[in-house]
């Protein structure tokens, strides 16, 4: 059995990590500079505490991106993606996670600015695996075209999602129109 002091330290450490990740998301959403000092101030912990858990701002961003992906995957896990074609399932997935995507736009922009492309891709690994599976299913059932590499199609989906959120946040498209515009564009790009 764990000692009470150890349990308390572990709980405190976990609360600190969550506070730092929340701070990262909040700062990114505001477009504020992501620095260790800013993360410490926003999270209410010291810079030493931030460094005790993360060795750099990119490591905080990677952890925050991983947590965001976990939220997306939790929503996806609650969805029934089995019926219909691969393209139908992909459209349902995009529609199901769409409400989360706007909340994560600042974090997405920050990871784009501060993480190397391979680190961004790794942070989104589970989402890409899910999308890759739906693309493969759609190619096999004939609902998704097979005249372009599947990896390219996954990158197109990723880029379109982030572009749609960015356009909404910059007033180029109404929020109410975002999901429908995204789904119809994905359908046009992918349909066999």
Where are these regions (language model features)?
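Basic, helix-initiating cap at the start of DNA-binding domains
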Residues: 1-42, 59
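Amphipathic alpha-helical interaction segments
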Residues: 19, 38, 59, 88-96, ...
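Short amphipathic alpha-helical elements of helix-turn-helix/winged-helix folds
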Residues: 23-30, 96, 100, 160
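Short hydrophobic/aromatic patch on the recognition helix
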Residues: 44-54
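Alpha-helical DNA-contacting segments of helix-turn-helix folds
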Residues: 58-68
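Hydrophobic alpha-helical connector segments
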Residues: 63, 74-103, 157
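Helical hydrophobic small-molecule/effector-binding pocket
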Residues: 87-112, 121-133
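Hydrophobic/aromatic-rich alpha-helical bundle segments in the mid-to-C-terminal region
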Residues: 108-113, 121, 125, 140-185
């Amino acid at each position: 059995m764990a000692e009470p002091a150890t349990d308390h330290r572990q709980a405190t450490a976990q609360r600190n990590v969550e506070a730092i990740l929340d701070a990262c998301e909040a700062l990114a959403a505001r477009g504020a500079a992501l620095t260790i000092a800013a993360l410490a101030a926003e999270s209410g912990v010291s810079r030493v505490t931030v460094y005790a858990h993360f060795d750099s701002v990119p490591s905080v961003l990677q952890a925050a991106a991983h947590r965001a992906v976990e939220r997306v995957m939790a929503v996806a896990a609650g969805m029934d993606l089995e019926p219909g074609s691969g393209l139908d399932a992909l459209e349902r997935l995009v529609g199901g996670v769409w409400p989360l995507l706007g909340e994560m736009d600042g974090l997405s922009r920050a990871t784009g600015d501060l993480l190397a492309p391979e680190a961004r891709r790794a942070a989104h690994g589970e989402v890409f695996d899910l999308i890759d599976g739906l693309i493969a299913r759609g190619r096999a059932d004939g609902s998704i075209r097979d005249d372009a590499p599947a990896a390219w199609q996954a990158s197109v989906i990723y880029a379109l999602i982030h572009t749609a959120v960015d356009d909404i946040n910059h007033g180029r498209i109404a929020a109410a129109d975002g999901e429908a515009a995204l789904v119809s564009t994905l359908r046009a790009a992918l349909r066999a």
